[in-house]
């Protein structure tokens, strides 16, 4: 799996954890091991510009996903998805820090960025949360992936509760 993490935000973030949880999420979703993903960490100003440009919404947001090859998880009878370029995930640590502090289970900026990385990966794979059934499926997968990764890493305490809707 080729995953690049590029921190352009000026904020210190745990890039290794972002890389690790992205790799875990893609493996868990059975994405081809030679697929490519880019994660860019930007400041609030850059995120606001992207949010306006692509969503026509004011203010910065927490995570945006830009799919490339529209890869999907393989069906039950397929071994793995075809190789391809997944796309880009853009994260904003300033928004993540605020959301983590305000979440039902308060958690750190880095924990929020890990959750948002999984959220972004799922969006790249075609998952969405516009409808209640879609939201239940996506957030269920998101929680299972974050919980599995935390267990594998030996992290204790409650997993971060979703702050994106």
UniProtKB/Swiss-Prot annotation:
This entry's Enzyme Commission designation comes to 3.1.-.-
Query: Which UniProt key words apply to this protein?
Result: Cytoplasm, Endonuclease, Hydrolase, Metal-binding, Nuclease, Ribosome biogenesis, rRNA processing, Zinc
Per the record, the domain of life is: Bacteria
Identify which cofactors the protein needs according to its UniProt entry: Zn(2+)
| This protein's record includes keyword Transmembrane helix | no
Q: Where does Zn(2+) bind?
A: 119, 123, 129
Which BP terms does GO give this entry?
rRNA processing
InterPro entries per the UniProt record, alphabetical: MetalPrtase_cat_dom_sf_prd (IPR023091), YbeY (IPR002036), YbeY_CS (IPR020549)
Cellular component GO terms held in the UniProt record: cytoplasm
**How many cofactors are bound and how?**
Binds 1 zinc ion.
GO function terms (MF aspect): metalloendopeptidase activity; RNA endonuclease activity; zinc ion binding
Homology family: Belongs to the endoribonuclease YbeY family.
The name on file for this protein is Endoribonuclease YbeY
Originating species: Streptomyces coelicolor (strain ATCC BAA-471 / A3(2) / M145)
Native organism taxonomy:
Bacteria, Bacillati, Actinomycetota, Actinomycetes, Kitasatosporales
Encoded by which gene?
A: ybeY
């Amino acid at each position: 799996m080729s995953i690049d993490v590029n921190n352009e935000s000026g904020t210190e973030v745990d890039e290794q954890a972002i890389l690790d949880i992205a790799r875990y999420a893609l493996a868990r979703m059975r994405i081809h091991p030679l697929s490519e993903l880019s994660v860019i960490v930007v400041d609030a100003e850059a995120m606001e510009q992207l949010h306006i440009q692509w969503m026509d919404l004011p203010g910065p947001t927490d995570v945006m996903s830009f799919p490339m090859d529209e890869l999907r998880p393989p069906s039950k009878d397929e071994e793995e998805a075809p190789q391809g370029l997944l796309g880009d995930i853009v994260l904003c640590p300033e928004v993540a820090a605020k959301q983590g502090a305000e979440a039902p289970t308060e958690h750190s900026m880095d924990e929020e960025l890990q959750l948002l990385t999984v959220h972004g990966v799922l969006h790249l794979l075609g998952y969405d949360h516009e409808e209640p059934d879609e939201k239940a499926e996506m957030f269920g997968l998101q929680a299972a992936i974050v919980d599995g990764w935390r267990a594998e890493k030996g992290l204790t305490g409650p997993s971060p509760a979703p702050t994106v809707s």
